[in-house]
A protein has these predicted regions:
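Enrichment for repetitive, rod-forming helical segments
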Residues: 91, 226, 233, 253-255
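Catalytic core of nucleotide-sugar-dependent glycosyltransferases
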Residues: 130-131, 196-239
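Nucleotide-sugar donor-binding/catalytic module of glycosyltransferases
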Residues: 1-209
Length: 256
């Protein structure tokens, strides 16, 4: 958490406020944040009212309570590169969104291990993703390529993200889906803007995972779950549509 906070306070863009909602952590996270509060006026700790909501709804609860023209999600063990906020705001301004138009910027990132050794200099390249090829509602619903810790979005995007559907799997997937469905503007920064720690069991993106070593039963179960999610959000109308989309995306990624 200290590395994350230090990277935040090392940003070239400084006009921001950090809102924190602790979701029942049992370590010394809050005490560390409180120590930073003594030196920095722009940290606000939100009362969790004794509720443990899980990662998804913890982010959404915090988002709902904060009023701001722009929002960014931040994970406690990632490291932001110094120009991250500055570069994303510049990219957002180029979208020319008015107050009635939801807008979103997402970026590439570097995958690192727990000691910040680089595992992949480009997350997008490692998963065979290009925003020049994939940048639509159905593709986001399928791939989940917009990662929460790289997102910057406006107040209108926040407003249309509520209420939250029960079928939504994660905050980043859901907010991005809502923006696409509302015909909002989505842009990106191609260069990595942060270091994302890859732990043993964590997953970046909702369906970005290797199928190697999985038996047919497991694969079919995962496909069924993904299809149902995409049907619920309106990305596909039938299992046949889902299979066609899956094949199209698979073939496109071979050339990236």
């Amino acid at each position: 958490i200290r590395e994350q906070l230090d990277s935040l306070f090392a940003q070239t863009y400084t006009d921001w406020t950090l809102f924190v909602r602790d979701d029942g952590s049992t370590d010394n996270t809050i005490s560390i944040i409180e120590s930073y509060q003594k030196e920095h006026h722009n940290i606000v700790i939100i009362d969790n009212e004794g509720k443990n909501l899980g990662p998804f709804m913890n982010f959404m609860e915090l988002l709902q309570k904060v009023d701001s023209p722009l929002y960014m999600f931040i994970d406690q063990d990632d490291v932001w590169l110094p120009h991250k906020i500055e570069n994303e705001i510049a990219a957002f301004r180029s979208l020319n969104c008015d107050e009635t138009t939801p807008g979103l910027i997402f970026t590439n990132l570097q995958l690192v291990d727990e000691n910040l050794n680089v595992l992949s200099a480009s997350f997008w390249k490692s998963i065979h993703f290009s925003p020049y090829i994939f940048n639509s509602f159905t593709e986001q619903a399928f791939i989940g390529y917009i990662t929460g810790c790289t997102m910057l979005f406006n107040k209108k995007a926040k407003e249309i993200s509520f209420p939250v559907a029960q079928y939504a799997p994660m905050h980043d997937w859901w907010v991005a889906i809502c923006i696409y469905k509302a015909n909002g503007k989505v842009g990106f920064v191609e260069t990595p803007q942060m270091l994302y720690r890859k732990h043993g069991n964590n997953v970046t993106g909702n369906f970005v995972s290797s199928q190697k070593g999985k038996n047919l039963c497991v694969r079919f179960k995962e496909m069924t779950t993904q299809y149902q999610l995409m049907k619920n959000c309106g990305a596909v109308s039938s299992f046949f549509n889902y299979i066609c989309l899956k094949s199209k995306i698979k073939n496109a990624r071979k050339n990236i």
